A protein has these predicted regions:
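Class I SAM-dependent methyltransferase SAM/SAH-binding core
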Residues: 24, 28-73
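Conserved catalytic loop of SAM-dependent methyltransferase domains
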Residues: 152-175
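Conserved alpha-helix/loop element of class I SAM-dependent methyltransferases that forms part
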Residues: 2-19
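A short acidic, Gly/Pro-enriched loop at the edge of an enzyme's catalytic core
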Residues: 74-84
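Conserved class I S-adenosyl-L-methionine
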Residues: 113-138
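A short glycine-rich, Lys/Arg-flanked "PGG" loop and its adjoining helix->strand segment in the class I
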Residues: 96-111
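Short alpha-helix
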Residues: 132-150
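A short SAM/SAH-binding and catalytic strip from SAM-dependent methyltransferases
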Residues: 83-95
Length: 175
């Protein structure tokens, strides 16, 4: 799974525009993506409302990364960013408030790179995926209404399903 995570962030990083220097990692977790992007030479700030993640980030990066302990919707940017990076954190952000905050935190001509799982269909399912994801059409419409233009859309499903299926098999068999 660790190798799959590395391939995933490496793939996401390929979408970062070449002129990007400053990145805000929204929903940074314990800093895997932050660490990867720092090694690529970007200037990073990280954000999470989680206290445990705050302690890990502070210990892991010391003063190399400014950490913002808040929800993205409540973030008060002191600087503007070339790119806002949301990897597997989109589903925790209120759609309209998130786009408004992204607009506020980005430099003119800045980018929002959002990667998460979205609901593409309405099957009235009770699955956790259905309950914890944003509807893709609603998300894209809000992006447009908030002045964002879709540059690239990529469906990662085929590349991730084998890993997810294996993890599910492992859990069901051994746990």
């Amino acid at each position: 799974i660790k190798n799959a995570q590395y391939r995933y962030i490496d793939h996401l990083a390929s979408f970062i525009p070449s002129k990007t220097k400053t990145i805000l990692d929204v929903g940074c977790g314990i800093g895997g993506n932050t660490s990867f992007l720092l090694k690529k030479g970007y200037s990073l700030e990280a954000l999470s409302p989680d206290s445990y993640q705050k302690s890990v980030i502070k210990e892991k990066f010391n003063r190399d990364v400014t950490f913002h302990h808040c929800k993205f919707e409540n973030f008060k940017p002191e600087t503007l960013f070339d790119l806002i990076f949301e990897s597997e954190s989109v589903c925790y952000i209120d759609i309209d408030k998130g786009f408004k905050k992204a607009r506020e935190a980005l430099k003119e001509g800045g980018y929002l790179l959002a990667s998460d799982y979205f609901v593409f269909f309405k099957d009235h399912s009770n699955s956790l995926h259905f309950k914890s994801s944003h509807d893709m059409d609603t998300y894209l419409n809000s992006a447009k209404e908030n002045g964002f233009n879709l540059i690239k859309q990529y469906d990662q499903t085929e590349n991730t399903m084998l890993t997810l299926d294996y993890a599910n098999y492992f859990i069901e068999r051994f746990i």
